[in-house]
């Protein structure tokens, strides 16, 4: 059973809104314009039976909201021919679009280079300007020399040097995008080291230049402020993972027969995404989407591994955040 794009868009009308108050220093404010962009994370085409419809609903909503650009935050799809129709949905967007590399985008034996080539990415980490704001995309999939097994989750020395140089050679307000969180313990394993670079940029600028850092990966709806920088975890578009011990059927049997990985998830009835507006007069707004669980929730399944995690919910919710943007004297 598939929800239609119209069903998904109807659910999006119940979106929450987060308002961030800010004040830009005069030396940068003159070059800023209102910026509107859409952000989705962890669609997981290779798990979800209705990933194409979910992605299409997101893009249709962003078109109606007149977004300047859209971004997907990783764990998008494996770079293989079977996913070409899904890629075509993504590439149907007529404006600017940006990609972040997730760890599961290399499942099936694919490399980062394979994924980048599949989506037309020159590099896994890069920077771009939109309406006077500088976006910095990081690749959290480096592997350091003494890394344990499992998926790599590191920002290497070369990339950190590039980040430092990019921040020191520019003056614009900054938004950071990375798949794995820089503050979650199961995110980037040297997240504190990367955060220190961002904090140093704020100190050098004399104001809260790094407006926010957005990530996906954890399938959580959460926000934590660390040393004046908000770290926003954008929930998965599709589900929360509950694993083998809590596998169950949320959809009709025929759906699970064709898409067996869904049984390890608690799916969201509607696709989740965030719509962000940055107003040069001094306001950052995050609109989200509220949905519901398909079948039992993780709590109803007795899922214990996530009992201490914040943000296990089928929503991208409203939040109130205060940013100190005034230039220090």
Which residues make up each language-model segment?
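Short acidic, glycine-rich surface-loop motifs adjacent to enzyme active sites
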Residues: 167-185
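Residue-level marker for buried hydrophobic side chains located in beta-strands
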Residues: 37-39, 70-72, 99, 176, ...
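Extended active-site neighborhood of metal-dependent phosphoesterases/phosphodiesterases
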Residues: 81-169, 193-210, 220-264, 268, ...
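N-terminal secretory signal peptides and thylakoid transit peptides that target proteins
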Residues: 1-16
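Active-site glycine-centered loops adjacent to acidic/histidine catalytic or metal-binding residues
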Residues: 42, 74-75, 102-103, 179, ...
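A short C-terminal boundary segment appended to hydrolase-like catalytic domains
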Residues: 257-329
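N-terminal active-site segment of His-dependent metallophosphoesterases
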Residues: 22-85
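Short, well-ordered beta-to-alpha junction loops that form the rim of enzyme active sites
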Residues: 140, 177-182, 217-218, 289-291
């Amino acid at each position: 059973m598939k929800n239609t794009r119209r069903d998904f868009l109807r659910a999006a009308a119940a979106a929450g809104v987060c308002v961030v108050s800010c004040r830009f220093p005069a030396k940068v404010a003159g070059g800023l314009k209102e910026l509107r962009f859409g952000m989705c994370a962890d669609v997981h085409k290779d798990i979800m039976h209705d990933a194409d419809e979910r992605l299409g609903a997101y893009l249709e909503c962003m078109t109606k909201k007149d977004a300047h650009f859209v971004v997907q935050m990783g764990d998008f799809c494996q770079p293989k021919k079977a996913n070409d129709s899904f890629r075509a949905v993504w590439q149907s967007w007529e404006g600017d679009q940006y990609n972040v590399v997730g760890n599961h985008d290399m499942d099936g034996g694919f490399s980062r280079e394979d994924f980048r080539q599949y989506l037309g990415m020159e590099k896994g980490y890069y920077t771009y300007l939109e309406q006077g704001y500088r976006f910095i995309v990081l690749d959290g999939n480096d592997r350091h020399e003494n890394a344990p097994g499992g998926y790599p989750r590191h920002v290497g020395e070369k990339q950190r040097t590039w980040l430092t140089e990019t921040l020191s050679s520019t003056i614009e307000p900054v938004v950071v995008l990375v798949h794995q969180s820089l503050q979650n313990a199961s995110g980037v394993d040297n997240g504190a080291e990367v955060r220190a670079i961002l904090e140093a940029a704020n100190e050098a600028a004399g104001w809260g230049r790094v407006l926010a850092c957005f990530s996906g990966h954890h399938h959580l709806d959460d926000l934590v402020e660390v040393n004046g920088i908000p770290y926003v975890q954008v929930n998965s578009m599709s589900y929360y993972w509950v694993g083998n011990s809590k596998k169950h059927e949320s959809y009709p049997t025929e759906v699970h027969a064709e898409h067996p990985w869904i049984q390890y998830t608690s799916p969201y009835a509607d696709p989740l995404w965030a719509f962000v507006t940055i107003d040069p007069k001094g306001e950052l707004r995050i609109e989200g989407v509220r949905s519901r669980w398909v079948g039992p929730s993780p709590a109803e399944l007795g899922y214990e591994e996530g009992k201490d995690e914040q943000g296990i919910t089928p929503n991208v919710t409203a939040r109130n955040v205060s940013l100190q943007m005034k230039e220090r004297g």
